[in-house]
Regions:
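N-terminal leader/targeting helix
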Residues: 18-48
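A short mixed-secondary-structure module that forms the rim of ligand-binding clefts
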Residues: 37-75
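Charged, gly/pro-rich active-site loop segments
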Residues: 80-138
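Short, surface-exposed beta-edge/turn micro-motifs
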Residues: 15-17, 44-46, 63-66, 113-115, ...
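Short, basic and Ser/Thr-rich N-terminal targeting/leader segments
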Residues: 14-16, 30-32, 79, 111-113
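A short, Trp-centered hydrophobic/proline-enriched beta-strand micro-motif
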Residues: 10-25, 66-70
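Short Pro/Gly-enriched beta-strand edge/turn motifs at strand-loop
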Residues: 2, 15-20, 99-102
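Charged, amphipathic alpha-helical segments
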Residues: 1-6, 50-56, 102-104
Length: 138
């Protein structure tokens, strides 16, 4: 199990794009491509920044069930995680993850009311490599 978590962590730390999934008001899945925050420390908590007004933030408040998918395309490796997503809006958490270039998305800066952080806490996952997959707990 430790080996699989090491492989998954490697994919996590090197992935450029992440796909996050939420459930809409009719319980149909919605997928969105997002960039991760620059600080990636652990698979146990994965953070993204987004607009407070975004459809996904609204959906996560209603139903926190979520999934996250990321991959290393060239190596043929992918990871699907399922768990819970929280919408965080405290100034402390916003300050922690703020980057200078974020004004491109949040023009009012770190105090922009339309800037929030999504915190994903995975429960389990599936690691894909070539034509095989392995289920694991996080």
């Amino acid at each position: 199990m430790k080996d699989i978590l090491n492989l998954v962590t490697d994919v996590y730390k090197k992935s450029k794009l992440f796909f996050i999934g939420s459930m809409d008001e009719n319980d149909f899945p919605n997928i969105k491509v997002v960039f991760p925050v620059k600080e990636r420390t652990s698979l146990k908590e994965i953070y993204f920044s987004t607009n407070t007004s975004s459809k996904h933030a609204v959906q996560y408040r209603r139903n926190p069930k979520a999934c996250v998918y990321f991959l290393k395309f060239i190596k043929g490796r992918g990871v699907l995680l399922t768990g819970k997503m929280e919408v965080l809006e405290t100034q402390e958490i916003k300050n922690h993850f703020w980057n200078k270039g974020d004004t491109k998305y949040y023009p009012k800066g770190v105090t922009d009311p339309d800037y929030c952080i999504l915190k994903f806490t995975p429960i389990c996952g599936r690691y894909y490599h070539r034509y095989k997959s392995v289920d694991f707990k996080v």
